[in-house]
Design a protein with these regions (language model features):
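C-terminal binding/interaction regions
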Residues: 6-8, 12-13, 91-144
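Short, solvent-exposed amphipathic alpha-helices that sit
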Residues: 15-26
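Accessory recognition modules or surfaces
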Residues: 1-5, 11-17, 43-46
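Short active-site oxyanion
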Residues: 4-5, 60-63, 82-84
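A general structural signal for well-ordered alpha-helical segments in protein cores
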Residues: 17, 44, 48, 73-74, ...
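A short beta-strand-loop structural module common to alpha/beta enzyme folds
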Residues: 30-41
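Short, structured active-site "lid" loops
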Residues: 47-69
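Mid-chain, well-packed structural core segment of small domains
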Residues: 65-107, 111
Length: 144
């Protein structure tokens, strides 16, 4: 069975989202594309909330969100209980977000990273496991 990954982006992240979808489908993943579906200007919360809701409702699911800076869509996702969205701009940050913070959504800043950097971070994010241990204690303190 293919691993299902929800993905969403605003207009600034549309092109990168399409590249990510193609990359992951070639690797055998199934993507649930919540949009957007063009470069027409839209509002990032309309695409961040559905991804975050799906991750929130499904244990062990990982999601991908993209906007211009990554900030707005990341803030949107983190409003959901149980979602730990990490804004990543370097591969090491994506790795540590999973290993130490049990991040379940990666947020990417489309205007500030290359396609190659994005794909490397996503591959890392999807392959790295949470270390648990002392990190679990810290993650348990995140939710309000």
């Amino acid at each position: 069975m293919k691993k299902l990954i929800p993905i969403g982006a605003d207009h600034a992240g549309f092109e990168l989202k399409q590249i990510v979808i193609n990359h992951l489908e070639q690797k055998g993943y199934e993507l649930k594309d919540f949009g957007c579906y063009s470069e027409d200007s839209i509002d990032y919360p309309d695409f961040g909330h559905p991804v975050a809701s799906m991750v929130e409702e499904n244990d062990n699911m990982l999601g991908i969100i993209i906007c211009g800076s990554g900030n707005g869509i990341n803030m949107t996702a983190n409003k959901h209980q149980g979602v730990r969205s990490a804004l990543c701009w370097k591969n090491e940050i994506a790795q540590l977000a999973r290993e130490h913070n049990d991040a379940n959504i990666i947020a990417l800043p489309a205007r500030f990273i290359t396609e190659e950097e994005a794909l490397e971070m996503i591959d890392t994010f999807l392959s790295v496991e949470f270390e648990g241990g002392r990190h679990q204690r810290r993650v348990n303190k995140i939710s309000c």
